[in-house]
UniProtKB/Swiss-Prot annotation:
Domain of life of the organism encoding this protein: Eukaryota
Described purpose of this protein according to its UniProt entry: May play a role in defense against fungal pathogens containing chitin.
Catalytic activity: Random endo-hydrolysis of N-acetyl-beta-D-glucosaminide (1->4)-beta-linkages in chitin and chitodextrins
Protein name (database record): Chitinase 9
GO BP, sorted A to Z: cell wall macromolecule catabolic process; chitin catabolic process; defense response to fungus; polysaccharide catabolic process
Gene (UniProt): Cht9
Family according to the record: Belongs to the glycosyl hydrolase 19 family. Chitinase class I subfamily.
Protein keywords: Carbohydrate metabolism, Chitin degradation, Chitin-binding, Disulfide bond, Glycosidase, Hydrolase, Plant defense, Polysaccharide degradation, Signal
PROSITE patterns: CHIT_BIND_I_1, CHIT_BIND_I_2, CHITINASE_19_2
E.C. code: 3.2.1.14
Length: 334
């Protein structure tokens, strides 16, 4: 959004086209190579951990590396550990397909957001993409990438491959001049530091940088630049926001995994389970409760594209047009 308004007019040559020619990764198609991280090698030479990879025709590591690893995706809840839950839902090649144009020459964040950085960051949040059945896990990844893609989009209406193929084009707010510092005894601003939007969720304000840094073991009040210079830290801040409830708001994770039960006050305010409540959590004060809004529609567009690629349904209540915003509190993006 901060990045979005600047990026709408982004025009690029059609150089980085959708034709991704990616060589097979394993098995007979790749000289007998094994998949990394104990993933299964499918009959077609691709690495993954779902039944499509580990089932009929699997060439190697079909039961993981000596039992316990690998597996066939799905199953009940529980933590993934080691970032494996994300890997089980989204392979590296699928990640490249979802965030198709993030490394385009016109994107300021090109080369920054990597699959390995996401997997490493997710290891610090073992419940992410590890709660519920296979469809629920995929839906959480689609929702997370959908919301963060809107925050970092470089797309426009007639962009190559459509506007929803241009997530993760930005890593920090463009043209920020304000410090985004709110006086706080608990999270005091450091001299000469600015807390404008950075990273996938466009983390903003000292009262977000402080607790996010504390949670992930980084001093982000004194070093807010880390969110735009270290891709693992960057993803960790977004996942921290996603996984952490901030009363009266539930966590995005609890909403998308069906673990949030709205109160009578929530129901009266139109806040019912679904993707729309996540938009309300992130930026409801500016986007929700005012009727149709292009920003809300953009968030939905990304989410729907990712659900389509992952082969899952969207669920209900996708927008927040008629929802009253939560009380002012955590505001990750403007």
């Amino acid at each position: 959004m901060k990045a979005t308004t600047t990026a709408v007019a982004l025009l690029v040559a059609a150089a980085a086209m959708a034709a991704q020619v990616v060589a097979e990764q394993c098995g007979s198609q790749a000289g007998g190579a094994l998949c990394p991280n104990c993933l299964c090698c499918s009959s077609y030479g691709w690495c993954g951990s779902t039944s499509d990879y580990c089932g009929d025709g699997c060439q190697s590591q079909c039961d993981g590396c000596g039992g316990g690893g690998g597996g066939g995706g799905g199953g009940g809840g529980g933590g993934g550990g080691g970032g494996g839950a994300v890997e089980a839902v989204v392979s590296k090649e699928l990640f490249e397909q979802l965030l198709l144009h993030r490394n385009d020459a016109a994107c300021p964040a090109r080369g920054f957001y990597t699959y390995d950085a996401l997997v490493t960051a997710a290891a610090a949040f073992p419940d992410f993409a590890a709660t519920g059945d296979d469809e629920a896990r995929k839906r959480e990844v689609a929702a997370f990438l959908g919301q963060t893609s809107h925050e970092t989009t470089g797309g426009w209406a007639t962009a190559p491959d459509g506007p929803y193929s241009w997530g993760y084009c930005f890593k920090e707010e463009i043209g920020a001049t304000a410090s985004y510092c709110v006086p706080s005894a608990e999270w005091p601003c450091a001299p000469d530091k600015k807390y404008f939007g950075r990273g996938p969720i466009q983390l903003s304000y000292n009262y977000n940088y402080g607790p996010a840094g504390e949670a992930i073991g980084e001093d982000l009040l004194n070093n807010p630049e880390l969110v735009a210079s270290d891709p693992v830290v960057s993803f960790k801040t977004a996942l921290w926001f996603w996984m952490t409830p901030q009363s009266p708001k539930p966590s995005c994770h609890d909403v998308i995994t069906g673990q949030w039960t709205p109160s009578s006050g929530d129901i009266a305010a139109g806040r019912v389970p679904g993707y729309g409540v996540i938009t309300n959590i992130i930026n409801g004060g500016l986007e929700c409760g005012f009727g149709p809004d292009d920003r809300v529609a953009n968030r939905i567009g990304f989410y729907q594209r990712y659900c389509d690629v992952l082969g899952i349904g969207y669920g209900s209540n996708l927008d927040c047009y008629d929802q009253r915003p939560f009380n002012s509190g955590l505001t990750a993006a403007q």
